[in-house]
Amino acid sequence: MNNQSATMNTKDNPLGYKKESTLLVGFAIPCIISMLVTALYNIVDQIFIGQGIGMLGNAATNIAFPLSTTCTAISLLLGIGSATNFSLYLGAGEKNESEKYAGNGIVLMALFGIFLFLVTTIFLTPMLKFFGATNDVLPYAKAYTRITAFGFPFLIANTGMSKLILADGSPRYSMISMLAGAIVNTILDPLFIFVFNMGMTGAALATITGQIISFSISLRYKFHFKTIKLSRESFIVSAAHYKKIFILGASACFNQIAMTVVQIVMNNTLSHYGAQSIYGGDIPLACAGIITKVNMIFMSFVIGISQGTQPVIGFNYGAKKYARVGKTYLLALGAASALSLIAFACFQIFPRQIISIFGNGSDLYFKFSERYFRIYMFLTIVNGIQPVTSNFFNSIGKSQLGVFMSLTRQIIFLLPLIIIFPIFMGIDGVMYAGPIADAAAAIVCGYFTIRELKELKKLEINLTKC
């Protein structure tokens, strides 16, 4: 990368000189809203399905949820991978390369979306059974997923393109594209479920309608990039560009894949050990689904903050402004930790009230839900560390550490504990696996972060001497 062009570019681009806290707020808020919209597509369905269909409907959306996280994983792989490269080369003053990463990223989003739709349509029933569907839940899950699969290409493309739009310096446009679809989904859900009596099918139709509208708005931006101009050459397939997109998007993708794997294992564990308890198999599935969706709302804020740092950190690292890189990370970590404290208080004080939003149930249902909520989410207070740290390493081009950070909680700690603990503790083992994994992941991330911040300080000192 050309040092002279990078120095000149930082004078022209506000990412290189504007106050870090101002930039973080400007980029994080649209990212948070974007993440909230993604969460709301799931949680709004869950609320109206719970009120209109009941516990089996809630369990069905939980069974289908791994497919939603798979879509998110793919969109983050391609969206963050292309956007990170986009920012790094833009910061270095190489606009031609930025254009190629944007174009290649969009092509990949389209191809992966169509592929996932075809795979889901062909293997729907065995997939849902693999995800943990019981005989009672399966018909509801099939009715819902058969239709939402049509929206996968639009969901992947829209979520992925929103990262490029953000990296181009248009956080408000990214926010509007996501928000428009969520509003439509929220309006259509009660209309289709309650007025037209369409049940799970209605909820699914409302979801894909919102996704198509969001995609249409994002697609329009392809012709209106501010810092680059896409041409036919930008979309020409390049193995070298694909490879770097995959490398720098892997961290965020693996984090979502890890969530998917954990969700599948957890569903099967809950139904298996639940059947051996007083709760039965369906109550734990429904409760875990609700708690997962509620946690998504909290994590939308945390992940939104971490993603909001990506253009700032990526640009300044490419421009060798290391002090700004470290300061942006610490600001994001502080904001995420403050939100984690608020979430912890809500989860511990108001579990029954939160569960009640998603419909009624038996006393046994609420007893299990409250207990699960309080124990599993007990160390929410440290949950902001891992995603912010993972995104930090990814944004400075250290993808291997980013991937490792993204896997700490879900795969390295939580997954083994979910499998091992219930052998000795029954269904309670799933609950206690959560806080132990949270604590272990926070310690590991803290160690590597302190080491990296010291390295950034050394680089800044050496640069000043030169």
Task: Report residues per predicted region.
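Short alpha-helical transmembrane segments in multi-pass integral membrane proteins
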Residues: M1-A28, F86-P153, V195-A250, I313-L379, ...
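Residue-level signal for short hydrophobic patches within transmembrane helices
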Residues: S21-L40, V44, L67-I74, F150, ...
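Transmembrane helical elements of multi-pass membrane transporters/channels
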Residues: G26-D45, I147, N158, G181, ...
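Hydrophobic/aromatic residues in alpha-helical transmembrane segments
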Residues: I29, D45, S82, F123-L124, ...
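Helix-terminus/linker motif at the lipid-water interface of multi-pass membrane proteins
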Residues: L40-N58, L128-N135, L191-M198, T260-I290, ...
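Small-residue-rich hydrophobic transmembrane alpha-helices
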Residues: N58-L118, L155-S174, N267, L285-P351, ...
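Hydrophobic transmembrane alpha-helices of multi-pass small-molecule transporters
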Residues: T70-A73, N185-P190, F215-L219, I297, ...
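Short runs within selected transmembrane alpha-helices of multi-pass transporters and secretion channels
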Residues: G79, T148-L166, S174-A182, A203-S216, ...
